[in-house]
């Protein structure tokens, strides 16, 4: 992809699905899936106060999730710029079950299995560091355009 920083996209309401939903493959273009972690925050995050600890205190709950992409690239590799231009997320998210914030330094694995085949995995990820490591970047990046990372 040739990206040297985190990517961001917009998740529209109609693209947010709950666990157990049945989606039609015909509604997507060459669908691909990734295992991810998502968080819901309990307050708006003031970019001037943003720090790792401030963000950690702002987490209400954690979700394993499936990120759905339309795996279509029209240009030549590397495709990072095209990925960003097409909104990164592309096609939606399926939220798994809600998890409360665990104790610090908890190690976890996340695996996405589809049709009995391992599609994606995260191994030995440490809470909160591996899951929240890029949120500070996102908060400050959104602040450049006067967008506040909010809890709504």
PLM-predicted stretches and their roles:
Residues 131-152:
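A conserved acidic, glycine/proline-rich C-terminal tail/linker
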Residues 1-130, 144-145:
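Catalytic-core "active-site belt" of small-molecule-metabolizing enzymes
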């Amino acid at each position: 992809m040739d990206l040297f920083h985190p990517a961001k996209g917009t998740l529209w309401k109609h693209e947010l699905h709950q666990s157990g939903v049945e989606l039609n493959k015909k509604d997507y273009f060459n669908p691909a899936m990734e295992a991810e972690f998502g968080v819901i925050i309990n307050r708006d995050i003031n970019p001037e106060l943003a720090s790792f600890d401030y963000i950690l205190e702002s987490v209400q709950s954690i979700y394993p999730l499936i990120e759905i992409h339309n795996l279509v690239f029209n240009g030549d590799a590397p495709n990072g710029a095209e990925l960003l231009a097409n909104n990164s997320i592309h096609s939606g998210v399926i939220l798994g079950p809600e998890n409360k914030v665990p104790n610090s330094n908890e190690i976890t694995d996340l695996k996405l299995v589809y049709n009995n085949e391992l599609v994606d995995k995260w191994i030995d990820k440490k809470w909160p560091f591996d899951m929240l490591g890029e949120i500070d970047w996102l908060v400050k990046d959104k602040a450049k355009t006067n967008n506040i990372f909010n809890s709504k």
